Amino acid sequence: MSLGAKSRKLFFLAVNTGFVERGLPDRRCRDFYAERSRSGLYCAIVGNVVIPGGVGSNDACAEISSSDAWRQLAEGISEQGTLPGIQLTTAWRGYRGMKRFISVAGAHVPQEYRQVPASMSPLDVKTTFDALYRGSELAFQAGFRHLQLHAAHGYLFSLLVDRRLSPHSDLAADLVRRWVHDVASWGGESSLRFSLWTGHPSIDKHGQSQFIEIIVSLPVDYLDVSAGFYNVDKRLIYPTLPDVLSSRRTGTLDLARRYPHIQFIMSGKSSGAWDPSLPANVHVGICRDLIANPNFLRDRDQGCNDCMKCHYFSRGQSYLTCGRWTYPRVLPFPVKQA
């Protein structure tokens, strides 16, 4: 299986599995990541982990802490020869993720996205980043060596760094730079996930180029390119339709060619985009195909079939499932509550 440039890396991208018990990753979570952290995978990023004192996007989010459960999770990944990664995030008090795939709230959605940062003082912003710094220290102490800031999908960090939405974007960008410096000083890698567009025209049609300029100025090791805000249009976050997939890939590749000195992670069923002609600064992020099949890197014919069962929150469930998991050879561990 040729992936083009020898330096191209494969990432298992962040997903909120819901495999959580009392706010901590449970045995299902450990098994899930250990099963997928092999066969040449460079880094597995444990997804949607809430910073200390933060707010989860739903009730099935784990919060980083000094618990030994985090060390066990990181060890389970590293023992398979893969770099343990973790994605840190927070929403805000009163946040509710929508269960529909497309918002019917119209103009009210961007109003909320502007009101939340506007209601925060500079001290509030610094306090939020202090929690990120503390959470990053805890994650590194647990053994995670790749730390990702979740600044996408309409969660709090994505609002704070966006000048179109936040009066604190310059401050937030400076605080991200401090975070990158801290992670590098420990010997870790950093990445930032961001949304190329939100999916709401009243936001996307103004200031897009200035937003991108801020993002590419952040000195993270990798920029993980996503799209969409969760409470606007989830189809952009989880692209399935050919035109949406094409737009996501085209947008990522355009960025990579404009900024050849920056390392990008291409996501959005990007396992189907493996191509020796990809720019050398584009790495492959895989999510749904590896969710469906832990052995996907060895058996690429058995990946995601778009059954949509992984969208557990939208389906009113509390943890991740997959239609392919009915085959024991694909999922050799139980998915029932531990």
Regions found by a protein language model. Name each.
Residues 1-338:
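Flavin-dependent oxidoreductase catalytic cores
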